Amino acid sequence: MTGRTAMRALITGVGGQDGSYLAERLVAEGLEVHALVHPDEPLPERPGVTLHACDVADTARTRALVRDLVPDELYNLAAISSVARSWSEPDLVARVNGLAVAGLLESAWLAQEASGRPVRFVQASSAEIFGAPCRSPQDESTPIRPVNPYGAAKAYAHHLVGVYRERGLHASGLVLYNHESPRRPVQFVTRKITSTVAAIAQGRADVLRLGNLAARRDWGWAPDYVDAMVRSARAGHADDYVVATGESHSVRDLVAVAFAHVGIDDWERFVEVDQALVRPTDAADLVGDSSRIRAALGWCPTATFHDVVTRLVAADLDTWEGS
């Protein structure tokens, strides 16, 4: 391990949106990149990345892998990221989004202690840890009060990051607000909206069914949030950071911008509200104050809300046209 010439990184969740962008960036920077892939999932195409079949919740396997690799940077992006699924499978979400993080943090600390080589840990946390926040916008001092099983598991992991930071691990928790890209799965509301709008524009669909149109979120561009991860890993000291644009928009706003991009202004005639799609407990107005990471690490978003939505619609139009 002491003879390595390149920085080494280990990524969990490489099959997802953020993991794909992160892997591409680190490979381009010349790092030796390794990644975990669940044994039951197909291997993603990640050029330049060494893939390891391993369940992130298998503590013994992950501990052995981290011990053998001793990564300079460890990014934990693996998670079940559906709030809706956390209501139907709360035990699984707790294991993957919470307990698995405990195992990874301990593995990183043990590898660091045994090798004498620092391991820098980045945890992808979520604005859902704030639940129904008592103030808006939220920052790092906002009380953590999750209102769903997903948020609760992420909150547990977020607290653990602080515990291991005090123990001597360079561990940062990034409270990531909603961030999108064409690589976001279509089951998420942003992609559901933009893909359906693109289909309607091409005569392939005639209705968009949604839940709560008034729900508000802080939506950003995924590659910007990956940049925040890398900056936090390489910062002089570890900390927790809210990563957000600072702007709140409703689902209704998103729908309007998406339809406007395809030349449809009277979009209400295409939208149906389905109460079955409303979450049992939906978080209130989630909008983040990212002043700390902007000041400390020089991070700032590069894409506006309008940029994000129109990029998604354009990508979905291309997909439909190519099908």
Q: Which residues does each predicted region cover?
A:
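Conserved Rossmann-fold cofactor-binding substructure of NAD(P)-dependent oxidoreductases
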Residues: A53-E73
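N-terminal Rossmann NAD(P)H-binding glycine-rich loop of SDR-like oxidoreductase domains
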Residues: A9-E29
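N-terminal Rossmann-like NAD(P) cofactor-binding module of classical short-chain dehydrogenase/reductase
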Residues: E73-Y75, V122
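C-terminal substrate-binding subdomain of Rossmann-fold SDR/epimerase-dehydratase oxidoreductases
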Residues: T190-R191, T196-S323
